[in-house]
């Protein structure tokens, strides 16, 4: 254990898709200071997204310096650094110089679609699902690594000679912060690469062979809570987790059946399944999260495509509201949605339907329907879609949902949170601390060095600000949900398939 007596702070580095952030926490897990810096998004072609890895490192370093200065702290007062990051985004750099050979290919980038189609044609879907827990998609790192090695001249040969290194953003930052001494990732980030066997907890040789990725470029994989190395100023780097898994830990969802939903543009749902890697029959991803001390625990992950974006649509395209915050007021003005259902399948439907041909629709319109009813139906759609995913997770895992922890921008909406509790028939718990992702990284780092000693101590820090209890009778709940399911069924398979046009 490191001596942490005179070091009363932990810094969490939250490296996101559009900005880098640094958040300093004290021993009571209060936020002492925050710094944020946006960076440039590069779109070289339609569907392609890149970041400059050097800019990511520069903004992350600047945020750390700024957060320390704002709190009037010196680096020798920091007990540890925890890192959480945008997942799947891929960097390859030179071992000797630390210079990237290409921009970082971002998780949203679709350039490796053809590589993924070939994997499907080669009949690898079942193998990849069984081994990595993932579906074949350009989202994950494996096909991005192959694309760089295929397209940067001489890079595969250099990789074989051990001259190049691959990493997700956590790995890249640690390499830079330790002055090129440490090449490491954690189990949560490794589980998002499509190259990692989540059962044996090792890089999968067959996937490396299929994608022609030399093993020499891969980082060592470690637990999410341990000392990996030290920054140039001597601070231990002691926690790593991908952003969604960090939020799951920050919410203290460390036991099987505990789940969290992050309400953003879309919604990210993760449910802890403990020591059991559950293979989903409903299109969920099987991924690695963190157990009580940051050790490997499995989780199911599902995404809702349109959450907050549905409210943005009401504001920007339909002009029904001026501000997203107004939705709570309008939705609460009416006693129900007057039979209206809005299915926001603007880009198809995600889990558990996986229907790219579905399109959005409003159902149940009569002359008595007012704007308030439509606004209410839009908010309700977020809660219904969340139930769709959680029902599928419970079916897959056999775990009963104990409660739902929530974070993200939309959790400030009391109407939405209450309706979520009503339609799930379970407690919805909103934390006092909204920085759950950064808090998860801080918790993992703090546990590793003895800054915090036990899970019970952490649970006391993860204070729940408000619990929303279901106030709706079961018969009414199921009637509302049956209406939603009927509406969803009508939106399915709306667009013609490519071969029908």
Swiss-Prot record:
ATP binds at residues 17-19, 265, 308, 312, 409. SUPFAM superfamilies: Actin-like ATPase domain. Pathway: Polyol metabolism; glycerol degradation via glycerol kinase pathway; sn-glycerol 3-phosphate from glycerol: step 1/1. This is Glycerol kinase. HAMAP family: Glycerol_kin. It comes from the Bacteria. Sn-glycerol 3-phosphate binds at residues 17, 87-88, 139, 243. It comes from Pseudomonas savastanoi pv. phaseolicola (strain 1448A / Race 6). GO terms for molecular function: ATP binding; glycerol kinase activity. Its EC number is 2.7.1.30. The keyword Kinase applies. Inhibited by fructose 1,6-bisphosphate (FBP). It is an enzyme of class 2 (transferase). It catalyses: glycerol + ATP = sn-glycerol 3-phosphate + ADP + H(+). GO terms for biological process: glycerol catabolic process; glycerol metabolic process; glycerol-3-phosphate metabolic process. GO terms for cellular component: cytosol.
